[in-house]
A protein has these predicted regions:
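Conserved Walker
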Residues: 58-59
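ABC ATPase NBD coupling module
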Residues: 81-97, 102
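ATP-binding/catalytic-site motifs of ATP-hydrolyzing domains
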Residues: 74-76, 80
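Conserved structural motif at the start of ABC-family nucleotide-binding domains
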Residues: 19-21, 34-36
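The feature captures the beta-strand-to-loop junction immediately N-terminal to the Walker
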Residues: 50-52
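Q-loop/switch helix immediately C-terminal to the Walker
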Residues: 102, 108-121
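Helix-to-loop junction immediately C-terminal to a conserved catalytic motif
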Residues: 65
């Protein structure tokens, strides 16, 4: 089981909930990854997931960004249920990004090239894309 650690940034006064996973269950075939997992994240908090390989850390992040849909449960971002929304909606509307630990989406590209390729899918204006990267 993954251990969820939250740290609060000092002097950050807002406490708006920005992320909530509510009773998330994930199964790969008959294998239970986790069941009824719930947690929230407020503005000013940093989330860390700890645990050995295979306990569901990457699965949790894939659910948050929309690459994977849970078998049961809901994902809320800014109090909006986004469980059925694709990754492109979440990244564009909620400014969520994800950099995988093993070299990015396209293994032959640099980090900058990966960011550029992904940004082309969600930011139409080329000048704005170049500024952001």
């Amino acid at each position: 089981m993954a251990i969820i650690k939250k740290f609060r940034i000092k002097n950050f006064k807002r406490k708006k909930e920005i992320l909530k996973l509510d009773k998330i269950s994930v199964y790969f075939g008959k294998r239970k990854i986790f069941e009824d997992l719930s947690f929230n994240l407020n503005q000013g908090e940093i989330l860390g997931l700890l645990g050995p390989n295979g306990v569901g850390k990457s699965t949790i992040f894939n659910i948050i960004i929309g690459l994977l849909k849970p078998n049961y449960g809901s994902v809320f971002i800014d109090n909006k249920n986004v469980t059925d929304n694709p990754i492109f909606y979440r990244t564009k509307e909620h400014k969520i990004s994800y950099v995988p630990q093993h070299g990015g989406y396209f293994h032959d590209l640099t980090l900058r090239e990966n960011l550029k390729a992904i940004s082309e899918m969600v930011i139409e204006d080329k000048k704005l894309r170049d500024e952001k990267i």
